[in-house]
């Protein structure tokens, strides 16, 4: 019995020592941050060039696919109208696509200057003319 107790105590002490020596987390595991998370949110879009520059709110929301987002109300087209954008770090690309059901199409790009400002250029084609828009997005 004494031999069993000594064996048990030794085993417990070794276990405590081994598990107490596990490396501590330093909070810097270099795990990749989902690059589109900084884009998601409500933004004020201030058009500075184009046919009729305007200021309005857009929503950038998560989309299916690793680096895709949906942009609601681009070109003040309504929050039910969405343009799909591809995020690559600080760059946003809007491939040519229909914008709503009124025969408009949109394409363009943007660059995130910092976590609260995006500089954008996009083109909206209504079938008869193209509006070349320059805009600044500011995160709300």
Residue ranges and their predicted role:
Residues 53-57, 78-82, 102-107, 129-134:
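Short, surface-exposed coil-to-beta transition loops
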Residues 28, 119-140:
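Edge beta-strand at a domain terminus
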Residues 51-89:
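N-terminal glycine/threonine-rich, aromatic-flanked beta-hairpin/loop signature
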Residues 93-111:
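An anionic, turn-rich surface loop/hairpin at beta-sheet edges
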Residues 34-54:
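Tryptophan-anchored aromatic micro-motifs
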Residues 82-87, 107-113, 135-139:
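Extended lipid/amphipathic-ligand handling interfaces
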Residues 1-9:
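Bacterial N-terminal signal peptides that target proteins for export
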Residues 4, 15-40, 140:
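Bacterial Sec-dependent N-terminal signal peptides
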């Amino acid at each position: 019995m004494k031999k069993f107790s000594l064996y048990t105590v030794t085993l417990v002490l070794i276990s405590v020592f081994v598990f107490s020596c596990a490396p501590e987390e330093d909070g810097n595991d270099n795990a990749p941050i989902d690059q589109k998370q900084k884009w998601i949110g409500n933004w004020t879009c201030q058009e500075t060039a184009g046919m009729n520059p305007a200021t309005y709110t857009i929503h950038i929301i998560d989309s299916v696919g690793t680096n895709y987002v949906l942009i609601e109300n681009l070109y003040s087209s309504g929050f039910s109208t969405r343009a799909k954008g591809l995020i690559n770090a600080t760059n946003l690309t809007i491939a040519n696509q229909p914008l709503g059901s009124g025969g408009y199409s949109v394409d363009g790009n943007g660059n995130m200057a910092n976590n609260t400002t995006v500089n954008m250029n996009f083109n909206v084609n209504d079938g008869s003319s193209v509006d070349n828009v320059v805009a600044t997005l500011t995160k709300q």
